[in-house]
Amino acid sequence: GPLQRGAMVGGLDEAMAAVVRDRAGIGVEVVVTDLHTAFLRPAHGPVAASARVTGGGRVLCFCEAEARDAAGQVVATAMGTYRIRPKATVGEAACT
């Protein structure tokens, strides 16, 4: 059957977060603040996600991603906004 949509969203989110982490460097954590996904067609079999940074600065980063099936057809797209912040240290509240 087709790939479950939640798995597709998770893959697109992780692809975008990875490019933000690569850009931001070590010592930071990346948190999604806004995510929009469009499902274009059912995905059967393996799916590959790719992402790129489209803008932003030191605190917020904007990204786009797409998922393609084994035939190279785009099956889903996403846009996300990610917050970049210093990693919490031991004893620091996680919800700040």
Residue ranges and their predicted role:
Residues 1-17:
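Hot-dog-fold acyl-thioester-processing enzymes
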Residues 1, 38, 58:
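Flexible, active-site-adjacent loop/turn segments at secondary-structure boundaries
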Residues 42-46, 54-96:
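HotDog/MaoC-like acyl-thioester-processing domains
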Residues 12, 21-22, 72:
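Short, function-defining helix-loop hinge/capping sites that tune catalysis or transport
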Residues 17-48, 53-54:
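Hydrophobic beta-strand-centered segment that forms part of the acyl-chain substrate-binding groove
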Residues 4, 25-27, 70:
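Residue-level detector of alpha-helix boundary/anchor positions
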